[in-house]
UniProtKB/Swiss-Prot annotation:
Amino-acid positions noted as binding [4Fe-4S] cluster in the UniProt annotation, renumbered to this chain: 127, 131, 134
Keyword Ion transport among record annotations: no
Gene: rlmN
Cofactor note: Binds 1 [4Fe-4S] cluster. The cluster is coordinated with 3 cysteines and an exchangeable S-adenosyl-L-methionine.
Positions contributing to S-adenosyl-L-methionine binding: 177-178, 209, 232-234, 308
Pfam family for this entry, one: RlmN_N
Top EC class, one word: transferase
Protein name: Dual-specificity RNA methyltransferase RlmN
Amino acid sequence: MNIDFPFQQPSLYGYKLNELKSILSPAFRAKQIYHWLYHRYENDAMRMDNISKTMQNYIREHFALSQIYPIRVEHSIDGSKKYLFETYDGHCFESVLIQMRDKKLGHKGEVVESEKWTMCLSSQIGCKVGCAFCFTAKGGFVRNLHASEIVEQVVIMKKDNQMAPHKRVNIVYMGMGEPLDNIENVTRAIEILSESEGLSISARRQTISTSGIAPKIKQLGKLNLGVQLAISLHAVDDKLRSQLIPMNKAYNISDILTEVRAFPIDTRKKVMFEYLMIKGVNDDLKSAKKLLQLLNGIKAKVNLILFNPHEGSTFKRPEINDVRAFADFLIKRGLLCTIRESRGIDISAACGQLREKVKAENVSCETLT
């Protein structure tokens, strides 16, 4: 069992159930504790009232529970929420909860409305990749988040929104950081979150988004977790992509697509290619044609994202008519393509807007306790 804990005491959120069973006696206590952590969202051992005082004291003495603390949540007019977390060592990072509502016809012809939740998790404090369009990159890199800190983001957001333990949510590793630069902790978090006795969030409902570290895509594929893959492509030639994403100089488009073609994907799923559209940079039909050629033979879905303005950037948001023309070009030629509806722009929670810096802004926010 190789668990990297930076704390004086290891966090219970960093253990898989079988690992906890191997260190607690009797072993059934592990299942009880898992139930308290992930079904009751309890983070105080002394309130776990179906375990003995001896076990409560043992947990308190040998383990930590909360290692990240929600210090603020901002509410968007579209229902999204941005959470600001502080870590045990005094750093801050952000995650986003996205609420979407679906309407469909019921079996009697009535309109049925349902809500869907997506949690956009951070994997690092800051980021090393340095994408030219991303606000996170402006703050530099601080450190990796540990598996327990990734898992606890989900627990806190579920608890704060009074979600049932097995309420279906989608997880996207698209917050702060490059997930494959922290692959050990991210994949451990995926396994913990998918534990059937815990939150039971299937790996098929979890998506790792990467800027394209080709060897790590290969490593992830060999683990065969069943997780979904998203590639932050954003350009169709290496010259432009290297300007937007400096890592492209190490792992170019061809390197990335070679590993994508070999990546194990559920027969019902597709690899998502994220394409950030920037006015006058990559939003023309010539780029659409090249993108179509690049993805030929790949089970692909293209997600077009409109650039979200942020402090210090000279890039501009594209015209919606250009975005629609780009999408129509791909769709008419058989490539599945969607235009992402940006969520949380008013609270700087949209794609590319997250950053560690705590800003004194006049926004609707509350302190969590």
